[in-house]
Amino acid sequence: LQEKHQYPVRYVSSEGHEDVMIEHVTAVNGNDQEAASEAIAGCDIMATAVGARILKFIVPNIVEGLRKRWARTDAPLNIIICENLNDANKILEGMLKEQLSEEEKALFDARVGLVEASIGRMVPVQTEEMKDGDPMRVCVERYGFLPVDLAAFKGEVPEIQNLVPFEPFDFYIKRKLFIHNMGHATCAYLGGYVGRKYIYQ
């Protein structure tokens, strides 16, 4: 990714697929705490999308990034939490505060927004067939809106294309679980019954 500064996305549906290139991208290895924390210290907004079981492993990078940020600026940092996890904001807050001093906890409460997101876009585990000759290709469904918790932002809410700030956010979470997730489960069960391997088939 650092060599090409771009990666291909393939929108898939029952009608076929469309390829687009996502450009002007940089990457940081999460194992490099210095680089990761510098990115966090200087960013306008950040997000997590690592999976609920991996969340605890990125906490040290976030904590170090926050410390650097607080030493340089009073600007708030909003962290959009893109994890399929109930109460993800409370869980991440607990993990982060375990590593903060009392003084740092006060800064955290004043300057860090933990913004839950309702993940609607499906991104399956990428098979070799899906990669289609490019290990960086990502296959996704076309739906691209990201509802987020409006009330959780600190400072101004950023204007980002397809970001949907909303409150009360609990509505979006419940709707997603009872309608969106149910729809995918139903498709998977019925597809398995007729021998299909992927929902998009």
Where are these regions (language model features)?
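Substrate/ligand-engaging "lid" and interaction regions
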Residues: 1-23, 27-201
